[in-house]
Amino acid sequence: MKQLQDEITQALTKLDGGSEFHEDSWERPEGGGGRSRVLRDGAIFEQAGVNFSEVWGSHLPPSILAQRPEAEGHGFYATGTSLVLHPRNPYVPTVHLNYRYFEAGPVWWFGGGADLTPYYPFAEDAAHFHQTLKLACDEHHPEYYPVFKRWCDEYFYLKHRDETRGVGGLFFDYQDGQGVLYRGPNPKGEAANYSNQVGEPASRDWEDLFSFIQGSGKAFLPAYVPIVERRHGMEYGDRQRNFQLYRRGRYVEFNLVYDRGTIFGLQTNGRTESILMSLPPLVRWEYGYQPEPNSPEAELYDTFLKPQDWSNWTANQ
């Protein structure tokens, strides 16, 4: 997890070229700590945060025990790396990544994923991101991507807005190598239905899953950096910037209302500055906003905030 943080921050520093990461090391009184790295006011990134944490304690919080009751009464160990990158140019999408590992008494599991949140509709960007993640998944199991992509669409969904947070990517949790792949809260959703059709894959051990996490983590830079390089030089005006700031509001809404990592961090007395590092530095809300018909903003709502089969997209569609 530390190595992933190192590799990503080094690459992002080089990519941005205008600022560097500032590191805060912190300790958690109940056990553990972490390193938070934040780049601010860069040439490309308005704010970029890449966190590593490793914490332990005497008992898991209610948000985890609700899903894994067999961990009740055991101490826990949790480690992970997470990032959120908020670019300055509205044509460059925001991106999020998180990979984590938990142990509690007799149980252990991996979780995580990566997802893309564009402000303007470029289908080739969404397709590149998905295709790169799918390749990393396919090296380990042919059903990882189809299940975890659907789970991502389900998880990064703002129920009160009836829209996805972006074009998705991968999301998974409670992966211990046993049972069906989907372990989420919606037994009647698309992810569960697909996972049930596939059935239980062959048992996978700790090393198999750790290798999958490593491969997915390494796929992040090739999935995202080419998109940044393609878009960050595009000219934009007040209209695009205002729309970006408005759409960033959805990011805030999701992270404060639904995000499991935020809730876990706050319930376990994590470092608040690190937990809320995912929030953008500038954001705006607007009462009753409606995009103009047939505009790029309307296309975002009509196509990009609904689940699509991005990995099979081709340029002539």
From Swiss-Prot:
A single Gene Ontology CC term:
cytoplasm
Its quaternary organisation is: Homodimer.
> Which portions of the sequence form the region Important for dimerization?
38-47, 251-286
Tell me the active site: 96 (proton donor)
Record's keyword annotation contains Amino-acid biosynthesis = no
Annotated InterPro entries = Coprogen_oxidase_aer, Coprogen_oxidase_aer_sf, Coprogen_oxidase_CS
Q: Where in the cell is it found?
A: Cytoplasm
Q: Which reaction does it catalyse?
A: coproporphyrinogen III + O2 + 2 H(+) = protoporphyrinogen IX + 2 CO2 + 2 H2O
Major place of residence? cytoplasm
Gene Ontology biological-process entries: chlorophyll biosynthetic process; protoporphyrinogen IX biosynthetic process
Q: Which PANTHER family match?
A: COPROPORPHYRINOGEN III OXIDASE, MITOCHONDRIAL, OXYGEN-DEPENDENT COPROPORPHYRINOGEN-III OXIDASE, MITOCHONDRIAL
Name under which the protein is recorded:
Coproporphyrinogen-III oxidase, aerobic 1
Site feature location: Important for dimerization: 160
Gene3D superfamilies in the record: Coproporphyrinogen III oxidase, aerobic
The record's family statement is:
Belongs to the aerobic coproporphyrinogen-III oxidase family.
Q: What class of enzyme is it?
A: oxidoreductase
- Specify the species: Nostoc sp. (strain PCC 7120 / SAG 25.82 / UTEX 2576)
Positions annotated to bind substrate: 82, 98-100, 269-274
- Please explain the role this protein plays, according to its UniProt record: Key enzyme in heme biosynthesis. Catalyzes the oxidative decarboxylation of propionic acid side chains of rings A and B of coproporphyrinogen III.
Please give the superkingdom of this protein's source.
Bacteria
